[in-house]
Amino acid sequence: MAVSSTPWALVALFLMASSTVMAIPPRKAIDVPFGRNYVPTWAFDHQKQLNGGSELQLILDKYTGTGFQSKGSYLFGHFSMHIKLPAGDTAGVVTAFYLSSTNNEHDEIDFEFLGNRTGQPVILQTNVFTGGKGNREQRIYLWFDPSKAYHTYSVLWNLYQIVFFVDNIPIRVFKNAKDLGVRFPFNQPMKLYSSLWNADDWATRGGLEKTNWANAPFIASYRGFHIDGCQASVEAKYCATQGRMWWDQNEFRDLDAEQYRRLKWVRMKWTIYNYCTDRTRFPVMPAECRRDRDV
């Protein structure tokens, strides 16, 4: 039988070929109820828990968005969430899943899903803030429709690197480059947050496309509320020095050859913006970019 040449078929072939030599992925998250590790933070009446708290819906309408956060703060670990994004015409709508500290010179690790008009792909924007400095945006298209089913978005964070994953495929690496003068998140515990809100002043085509409220309510669905991190709400020094957790071990200090191959695939096929190659904003390439293999 002839093989289809559609983009989706090519993606499937790539993933099947990759599965023959699998890199070591982060551990699979364990599903637990929302209330075990998270609490609502605003617009409680725009959230709905289903199936005994194993599933959560965030609801955005013309009046308000909504959000939640983790109960504890964490310093290093593996942080994941199963998310199904709002469907249809979602221009102007942003769904975010991120870690952030709370002080002025804050650290932050971001997934932001930027909605689009019906038929146009959602954009996934990632960013890393260190010591209050961000401006490290990367944007990709996803190789699937993120509103059709749940997909897993996760961050591996240890003393050596931060890795963003989509369904265990690495889409971005931010290495510890302190020796190059680049700050790295290592001493500020972070909470996990997620929110759904209207950002039509910037999210879609730089704010040219406005939210169509005739399509509201917009609903983002969540599962997988386990947190596999070192809780530092009381004693951050323990998390920074103990080194016995699985994410500290040698196999998680760098990507292996197969993971770098997948990262290159994302960079070559799906990346639409990379701050490392933006010479208008950065005439001199940021120091971390070569180490992160982003050029």
UniProtKB/Swiss-Prot annotation:
The record marks 110 as: Important for catalytic activity. It is found in: Secreted, Cell wall; Secreted, Extracellular space, Apoplast. Residues 25-222 form the GH16 domain. GO terms for cellular component: apoplast. Residues 1-23 form the signal peptide. Disulfide bonds join 230-239, 276-289. InterPro entries: Beta-glucanase/XTH (IPR044791), ConA-like_dom_sf (IPR013320), GH16 (IPR000757), GH16_AS (IPR008263), XET_C (IPR010713), XTH (IPR016455). Xyloglucan binds at residues 112, 125-127, 135-137, 201-202, 206, 281. No hydrolytic activity detected in vitro. Catalyzes xyloglucan endohydrolysis (XEH) and/or endotransglycosylation (XET). Cleaves and religates xyloglucan polymers, an essential constituent of the primary cell wall, and thereby participates in cell wall construction of growing tissues. This is Xyloglucan endotransglucosylase/hydrolase. The lineage of its organism: Eukaryota, Viridiplantae, Streptophyta, Embryophyta, Tracheophyta.
